[in-house]
């Protein structure tokens, strides 16, 4: 059953009612399903983190362009120190997220022992940074940021949906701590 999510992604619902599988239908070794599922979800999560990184970067670029072009009180709004500080904070969070995504992607590619921990770190950082970049963008754009005329509102929706996909930031911080035995 097909659906369109709030962030314009396509989604589907698969219903398996009354399905029975015989012993010959088992994929992989019996009892090894959880480890395989963890690996698949880690791979999917790091791919999502890459998409989130691209989205937050684009939201930030749109916001920077708006700061450079929007006039208020006879000057560009990007000249206001308070907005410069907000932009610098978003930039820092995006770069931290970028480093985490790159480390997680390398760990997934290498089949590293700390793969799951690095993936959870990346997802937690990306969730927080993407929501921050989108929220700050909407705040800086003002009311027009919520209209369909400006893409920043789309990135806010995408940030919220991506944040919840494969576990939110709190889930991944808890997973990171559990894996690290904290």
Positions of PLM-derived features:
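Extended, low-aromatic, Leu/Ala- and acidic/polar-enriched alpha-helical coiled-coil segments
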Residues: 43, 50, 81-91, 120-123, ...
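A glycine-biased, small/acidic residue-tolerant capping/turn segment at secondary-structure junctions
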Residues: 106, 114, 130-156
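FAD-binding core of flavoproteins
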Residues: 1-61, 65, 75, 170
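Short, hydrophobic/aliphatic alpha-helical segments
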Residues: 36, 123-136
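Glycine-rich phosphate/cofactor-binding loops in nucleotide/flavin-utilizing enzymes
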Residues: 141-182
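C-terminal helix-coil-helix/basic helical segment that borders enzyme active sites and/or dimer interfaces
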Residues: 64, 68-78, 91-125, 138-141, ...
């Amino acid at each position: 059953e097909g659906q369109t999510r709030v962030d314009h992604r396509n989604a589907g619902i698969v219903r398996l009612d009354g399905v029975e599988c015989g012993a010959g239908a088992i994929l992989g070794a019996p009892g090894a399903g959880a480890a395989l599922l963890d690996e698949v979800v880690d791979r999917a999560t790091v791919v999502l983190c890459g998409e989130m990184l691209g989205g937050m970067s684009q939201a930030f670029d749109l916001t920077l362009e708006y700061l450079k072009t929007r006039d208020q009180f006879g000057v560009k709004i990007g000249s206001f120190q308070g907005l410069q500080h907000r932009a610098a904070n978003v930039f820092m969070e995006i770069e931290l997220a970028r480093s985490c995504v790159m480390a997680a992607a390398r760990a997934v590619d290498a089949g590293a022992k700390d793969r799951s921990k690095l993936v959870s770190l990346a997802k937690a950082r990306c969730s927080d940074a993407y929501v921050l970049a989108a929220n700050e963008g909407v705040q800086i754009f003002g009311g027009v940021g919520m209209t369909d005329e400006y893409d920043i509102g789309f990135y806010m929706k995408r940030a919220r949906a991506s944040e919840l996909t494969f576990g939110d930031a709190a889930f991944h911080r808890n997973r990171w701590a559990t894996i690290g035995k904290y």
